[in-house]
């Protein structure tokens, strides 16, 4: 059943005003910090860069290093990422030797390449006898480790801060800290609890095991084994681990900044298709620590649960999640698998070909990335990834992958205008509900075999898939952005499986709709707060906003269709909605409300009483997709660059720059004919990859191009003003 989903009085101008007001609200100190950060970034992000990790093997020589950097320069790379492994430079206590890394920096300078230096301050050397090998993160809460780490940072940053080849400092590779229950970590946890609760009495009103003092806290994983569990201590511990990682990163950043105020800082979180909060990662919090954000996106490892035909979809998901957390600042794809995986990739061994590399790279550039760095240039000679993932061949000669990358580097050099363009701002966002993603770690345990703990994540991904396949530009927004009112810049906000939301978030949603936003939700929206305390009705505290609610839940063992189309829309639950002013959009086969719409204030709220987005993730049904995307399509109608016709196998991106607009299409399916429109009167549109002029038509204020798109191909259209 179709309905007019565009909210009453919808106005892009209003959203622009919201953005302006948010910018004006930034404090003078924050503005000064942003200006300093922008100055550090400018020399590095003034162009779109390609790069690769250079791994310093112990068999390397000064001459072999120089040869590799000459090849990198020849094939268009301007960034070389390097791990400055602590054990490499301090094999014995206080015996520091960096001469082999000097080879790298000097070779980079000769080849006009910037070094992205990865610090390893959390990864102590072998002589300390704390780890069995490198890449084993240790506890940065330990003051003894921090003391040695500070010396390591001073030796590295102090040596290279004035080197002409120095680029950004990566504070930590794929940031994560060892989850531990050591005394120093408990001391940090006690201080965190004191900041959260203020008094022990307040904490003791919640925790099962009372404390005399915050400093007495001691937890262990045995407290949260399956069965009856103290939810309060579990959620506090999980939130602490997120903040504890941020504190460790912040400490490293402070050590770097005390030595070097010139070069930017960077990090590359990983696992973007996984439950990040459950693993101790908050992209938005980590992004705030550094000058610019990046991520590791390895299809070979990250997409093992997906079909290769959907790799483009999930690569796009990672890009949009990364871009959203980066905000208005530049961002990179800091690791992208560049070569064969034989043993290291588990169930997905592969070797990306020319067309795959092209689609990944152009989709990243179309999404707004200022750089893509491959993992890696040259193969390791020993270890878990020995002989794998490299761009060059095993003997060090350029492979067909290197040649393919050079073609793209040459195209970027011919298209300086692309570096001046920015991705078109989405009008649609999905709430990345950290609180639901944490709470499900407890709620989902009892049915682990059914992977219940994955449901909020899969619903989030299902929402993205439904929208991306309809070529709707998408942002993600987090809980804190929601609470500050930043979500008001979006016409439509999606809440997939957001069954846990704190009281402030619920109130922020109310304000979002009251001020003119369209809120779309499904399932047990806001049923619980962040600790798992249930609210008496669903949607929790928002019945007047949605114009319907319920106090009962009917679990559904198997998917159930509500229409004659056999769409299997009902998933997990059927909610007996009680109408309180809402308009019924869809009724089930028994005539009961299945989906409702309600005007509240200047906006509207749409609600489906089942886990609709989870069902779409699992079955990719067209009718279910339509129910999800209708409000987004209405909001997307006036976008300046649109894919008017094209299948869901196309990843579509739009950018605008001075006097130009770009459309980037990456086809992960069969050959087809596509139609792209540019709002306004453009003098010509060219295929930016071939230089060929496109035939134009004009209709209702748009410049329209119809063009064939080959299977597994990339099309970049550049529209030029007169």
Map each language-model feature to its residues.
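Polysaccharide-binding and catalytic clefts of secreted carbohydrate-active enzymes
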Residues: 137-155, 159-313, 321
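Hydrophobic targeting/anchoring helices
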Residues: 266-269, 273-462, 548, 552-566, ...
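N-terminal carbohydrate-binding accessory modules
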Residues: 32-79, 91, 106, 110, ...
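A conserved amphipathic helix/loop scaffold
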Residues: 496-722
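Aromatic- and acidic-residue-enriched carbohydrate-binding clefts of CAZyme catalytic domains
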Residues: 43-49, 74, 83, 92-95, ...
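The substrate-binding groove and active-site-proximal loops of carbohydrate-active enzymes
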Residues: 50-60, 83-99, 132-150, 172-179, ...
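Short, acidic/polar
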Residues: 59-74, 149-155, 275-286, 353-361, ...
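Aromatic-lined substrate-binding rim segments of carbohydrate-active enzymes
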Residues: 66-135, 157, 246-260
């Amino acid at each position: 059943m179709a309905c007019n989903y565009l909210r009453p009085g919808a106005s892009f101008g209003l959203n622009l005003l919201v953005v302006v007001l948010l910018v004006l609200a930034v404090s003078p100190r924050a503005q000064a910090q942003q200006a300093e950060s922008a100055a550090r970034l400018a020399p590095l992000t003034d162009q779109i860069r390609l790069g690769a990790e250079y791994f310093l093997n112990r068999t390397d020589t000064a001459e072999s290093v120089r040869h590799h950097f000459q090849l990198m320069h020849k094939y268009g790379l301007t960034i070389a990422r390097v791990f400055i492994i602590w054990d490499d430079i301090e094999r014995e206590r206080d015996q520091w030797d960096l001469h082999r890394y000097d080879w790298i920096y000097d070779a980079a300078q000769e080849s006009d390449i910037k070094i992205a230096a990865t610090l390893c301050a959390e990864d102590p050397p072998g002589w300390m006898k704390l780890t069995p090998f490198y890449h084993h993160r240790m506890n940065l809460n330990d003051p003894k480790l921090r003391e040695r780490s500070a010396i390591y940072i001073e030796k590295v940053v102090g040596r290279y801060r004035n080197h002409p080849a120095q680029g950004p400092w990566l504070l930590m590779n794929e940031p994560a800290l060892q989850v531990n229950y050591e005394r120093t970590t408990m001391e940090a946890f006690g201080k965190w609890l004191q900041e959260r609760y203020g008094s022990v009495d307040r904490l003791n009103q919640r925790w099962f095991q009372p404390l005399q003092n915050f400093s007495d806290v001691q937890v262990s994983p045995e407290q949260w084994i399956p069965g009856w569990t103290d939810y309060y201590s579990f959620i506090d511990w999980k939130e602490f681990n997120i903040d504890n990682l941020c504190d460790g990163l912040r400490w490293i950043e402070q050590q770097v900044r005390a030595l070097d105020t010139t070069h930017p800082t960077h990090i590359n979180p990983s696992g973007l298709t996984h439950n990040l909060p459950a693993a101790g990662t908050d992209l938005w919090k980590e992004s705030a620590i550094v000058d610019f954000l990046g991520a590791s996106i390895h299809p070979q490892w990250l997409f093992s649960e997906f079909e290769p035909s959907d790799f483009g979809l999930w690569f796009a998901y990672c890009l949009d999640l990364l871009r959203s957390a980066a905000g208005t600042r530049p961002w990179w794809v800091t690791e992208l698998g560049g070569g064969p995986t034989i043993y290291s990739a588990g169930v997905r061994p592969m070797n990306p070909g020319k067309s795959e590399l092209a689609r990944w790279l152009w989709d990243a550039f179309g999404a707004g990335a200022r750089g893509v760095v491959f993992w890696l240039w040259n193969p390791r000679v020993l270890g878990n990834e020995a002989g794998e993932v490299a761009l060059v061949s095993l003997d060090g000669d350029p492979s067909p992958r290197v040649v393919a990358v050079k073609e793209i580097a040459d195209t970027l050099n011919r298209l300086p205008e692309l570096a001046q363009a920015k991705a078109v701002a989405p009008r649609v966002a999905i709430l990345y509900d950290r609180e639901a993603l944490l709470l499900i770690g407890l709620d989902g345990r009892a049915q682990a075999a059914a992977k219940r703990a994955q449901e909020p994540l899969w619903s989030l991904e299902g929402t993205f898939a439904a929208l991306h396949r309809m070529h709707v530009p998408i942002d993600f927004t987090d809980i804190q952005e929601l609470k500050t009112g930043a979500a008001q810049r979006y016409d439509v906000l999606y809440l997939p499986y957001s069954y846990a939301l704190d009281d402030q978030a619920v109130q922020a949603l109310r304000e979002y709709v009251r001020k003119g936003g369209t809120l779309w939700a499904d399932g047990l929206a806001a049923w619980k707060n962040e600790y798992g305390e249930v609210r008496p009705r669903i949607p929790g505290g928002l019945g007047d906003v949605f114009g319907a609610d319920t106090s009962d839940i009917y679990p559904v063992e198997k998917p159930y269709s509500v229409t004659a189309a056999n769409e299997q829309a009902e998933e997990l639950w059927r909610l007996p909605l009680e109408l309180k002013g809402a308009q019924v959009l869809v009724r089930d086969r028994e005539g009961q409300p299945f989906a409702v719409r309600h005007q509240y204030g200047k906006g509207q709220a749409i609600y489906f009483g089942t886990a609709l987005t989870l069902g779409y993730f699992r079955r990719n049904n067209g009718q279910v997709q339509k129910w999800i995307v209708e409000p987004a399509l209405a909001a997307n109608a006036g976008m300046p660059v649109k894919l008017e016709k094209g299948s869901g196998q196309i990843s579509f991106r739009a950018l605008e720059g001075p006097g130009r607009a770009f459309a980037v299409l990456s086809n992960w399916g069969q050959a087809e004919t596509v139609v792209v429109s540019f709002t306004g009167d453009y003098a010509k549109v060219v295929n930016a990859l071939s230089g060929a002029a496109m035939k134009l038509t004009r209709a209702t204020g748009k410049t329209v191009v119809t063009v064939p798109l080959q299977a597994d191909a990339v099309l970049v259209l550049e529209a030029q003003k007169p």
